[in-house]
A protein has these predicted regions:
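Residues within the DNA-recognition helix of helix-turn-helix
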Residues: 51
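Amphipathic alpha-helical dimerization/coiled-coil segments
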Residues: 2-7, 76-104
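Alpha-helical residues within the helix-turn-helix
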Residues: 39, 56-57
Length: 104
């Protein structure tokens, strides 16, 4: 699997915000309406919209419109891809060249 480093750098930047990490944790329990997420954080609707836009643009979250409300769920395909990529980045074989370097 070839890694798109620019794409994953953007995803990790999105994940670097504690509030967005907590939103992902909340969504791990299943789909949630935006109003439930907003209640948890006691934030304004524009602030929530900004965070959810970043999560959706990263591909980690799927939006679903129902009337005037938006419901959010984890994109499990993208989450599994993220887990595999992190694993690939952390494989010992990836670091052997660095460990064997004689120029220290």
């Amino acid at each position: 699997m070839e890694i798109n480093y620019a794409e994953y750098a953007k995803i990790f930047k999105v994940l670097s915000d504690p509030k967005r990490l907590k939103i992902l944790d909340m969504l791990s329990g299943g789909e949630l309406c935006a109003c439930k997420i907003q209640e948890e954080f006691n934030i304004t609707q524009p602030t929530l919209s900004h965070d959810m836009r970043l999560l959706c643009e990263s591909g980690l979250v799927n939006p679903r419109r129902e009337g005037k409300w938006t419901h959010y769920s984890l994109n499990m395909e993208k989450m599994n891809e993220l887990y595999k990529t992190i694993g690939q980045l952390m494989l010992p074989e990836q670091f052997l060249g660095v460990l064997d370097c004689k120029c220290k």
